[in-house]
Structure formats: C-alpha cells, structure tokens
Amino acid sequence: MSAFGGPGGGQINQKPIPPQRGSFPLDHDGECKHVMTSYLACMKKVRGVNDNECREFAKSYLACRMDHNLMARDEFKNLGFQDVKDSSNKGDPAKKGELRW
C-alpha cells in the first residue's frame, strides 16, 4: 500500500524549533569582514585543523560581532572558548627533542 495516497498518509505537521541561540543579523556592511577573512586564511593555512592561532581569530570575530551588535553579547566560555591548559606540561618547559612522560 502506498503511503502517499492511503488513509492516514497525510503529512505530519510539526512546529519548527528555533535555533538554540536565536537568529542574528548578517554582516551586510562588512564591519567584521577583515577578521573573518583572516580566520578563513588561517583555516586554509592549517588545513582545517583546530589550531590555537585560528581559535584566536574566531574569538576576535565573535568579539567584533558582539561589538557591532550583530549578535547578542555573551561570555566566551559559553561560546566554547575556555582557557586550555595542558596538564602534562606542568613545571619547566620541554626542550626540543626531549621526551616527557
């Protein structure tokens, strides 16, 4: 039996769910374009790896959007930017070629 024409085969109406953080306006005036292009160039340079340098560009981009009222102001820790501290590198810094446990 076909689901298209059979009884009870009508579409189920579901209420659309809004995005978690709401919607925000696009940057039509290019107020943060310079930061965005720097971020995209960084991502291209590191071939898509989540590099700390690129994360700083992303953080700057979000700060620019918040400064120009293109998104709601929020703390960076809520946007996924937390102070990343590697627990394996405690104490003095490692020397090149040194194996650390």
UniProtKB/Swiss-Prot annotation:
Disulfide bonds join 32-64, 42-54. Residues 1-11 have a biased composition (Gly residues). GO terms for cellular component: mitochondrial intermembrane space. The keyword Metal-binding does not apply. Residues 1-28, 81-101 are annotated as: Disordered. Residues 29-72 form the CHCH domain. A motif (Cx9C motif 1) lies at residues 32-42. Its main location: cytoplasm. Keywords: Cytoplasm, Disulfide bond, Mitochondrion. This is Cytochrome c oxidase assembly protein COX19. The gene is COX19.
